[in-house]
Design a protein with these regions (language model features):
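N-terminal anchoring/stem segment of glycosyltransferases
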Residues: 1-75
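A structural signal for short, well-ordered beta-strand segments and their strand-loop junctions
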Residues: 37-38, 76-78, 108-113, 144, ...
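Short beta-strand-to-loop acidic/aromatic patch adjacent to the donor-nucleotide binding site
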Residues: 74-84
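Conserved donor-nucleotide/metal-binding helix-loop-beta segment in metal-dependent transferases, i.e.
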Residues: 87-118
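Short, flexible, basic/aromatic active-site loop/helix in glycosyltransferases
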Residues: 122-135
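Catalytic core and acceptor-binding pocket of nucleotide-sugar-dependent glycosyltransferases
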Residues: 137-202
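Hydrophobic helical membrane-anchoring modules
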Residues: 193-226
Length: 226
């Protein structure tokens, strides 16, 4: 299984100051069994066991597509670099989703965020199927993707907000977490419209107590605060 899945962190040069707190918490709360990649334009991430994929493009999807093309595995867990873990990742749920995707090729992804959009009941524990043509069938939040389908969905030239509104085929299946909020697979402090960073600035009410608890030093003034 570990040879079938990779993790791709969506990032950019201007967020390189976020990498230290992100990866500190990432590896503290996840004994990740997969190869981890980060995509950015030109900088090199120096974290041990993290491979940097430098890509350029006119739009966000152009860069991410080029990065995904370089990843050799059948599945990719994608997420952004401003999602700071607060408790252990539930690896057993990721394993469960992997095996269901192996058995059912029509499944495009399992999205691990708490859904705010319409869903339909399904047979998978703690998940529901996203209603056809609803928003966020493509999501930048933690998601286990079938790589070939992810590449198809990245074929346009879009920014991340446009991409999350992409209209997808009604023949494909997209699932999202509808279990208890206190049992999320990845807990990163999501509050509907923001988490650790909002519009490029630190959300102090969120990250200051978190980083103090985790003994992570950050100069909040460099990025600014809200």
């Amino acid at each position: 299984m570990s040879n079938d899945i990779s993790v791709l962190i969506y990032s950019c040069d201007s967020y390189s100051d976020v990498w230290n707190p992100f990866f500190t918490l990432f590896f503290r709360y996840w004994n990740c069994p997969y190869q981890v990649y980060i995509t950015t334009e030109s900088k090199e991430c120096e974290w041990e066991n993290v491979i940097t994929l430098n890509t350029t493009g006119e739009k966000w999807t152009d860069r991410i597509r080029k990065a995904v093309e370089k990843i050799p595995t059948k599945y990719v867990i994608g997420m952004c670099e401003d999602m700071f873990f607060r408790r252990p990742v539930r690896q057993e749920i990721i394993d469960y989703c992997y095996w269901e995707m192996e058995k059912n090729p029509e499944i495009v992804n399992f999205n691990f965020e708490k859904t705010l959009t319409p869903t339909e009941d399904c047979v998978y524990d703690n998940f529901s199927r996203r209603v056809c043509r609803c928003d966020y069938q493509c999501s930048c939040q933690p998601t286990l993707w079938r790589k070939d389908k992810l590449l198809e969905l990245l074929s346009g030239s879009q920014d991340p907000w446009e991409w999350e509104m992409t209209e997808v085929s009604p023949d494909d299946y997209y699932y999202v977490w509808t279990g208890n909020e206190d049992e999320l697979v990845f807990e990163y402090g999501y509050h509907q419209k923001w988490f650790g960073i909002q519009k490029g600035k630190w959300v102090l009410d969120d990250v200051r107590p978190l980083f103090a608890k985790e003994e992570i030093q950050v100069d909040f003034m460099k990025r600014g605060c809200v």
